[in-house]
């Protein structure tokens, strides 16, 4: 690769990283006021002719859940509505990406927080919205936090940027969820340093990335695992 082409490649890659806001990795916009407004909007939408036309005479199920720390519902959702449609169309949370529509690529993955505090991955393109009733989930918009008006990325998000882990970014929200769940598991059940590489591959194996060949994603996760006390045993 010539120096000119290499320079253009580096600039283009940096430009992609600067577009991170558009990929939804660092969004945290649901304060209480926004939550109240969105809840009202959701109820209006579900009473509109648009919803009636799209889901005519379809059985509905009750839905109440926690999303990014805010309670949503109770509302009635069509039995056939997927969770990703609910997030996109009625909560304006578009950072969770629709990929294959079959639960294979894991671009649509969000993180579920269980009552004991443990975390797991859940796909939103293959499960109905009503399936999430009573659950506590975190979308990509809820990963970062704000302090004194300054956005603070999670260690995984920052590591993905530092390692130039992605190019187009379409798979990145799913990788953030998957990597965060993996690190939570390591915190609870540390592993030996010699087993870390294999454990990362096994944990993120189902997440598909068509740009970077996974290596930089895995390197970023490894860096965070090694830098987090208690995750890895020497």
Where are these regions (language model features)?
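Signature of N-terminal electron-transfer/Fe-S-associated modules in redox systems
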Residues: 2-234
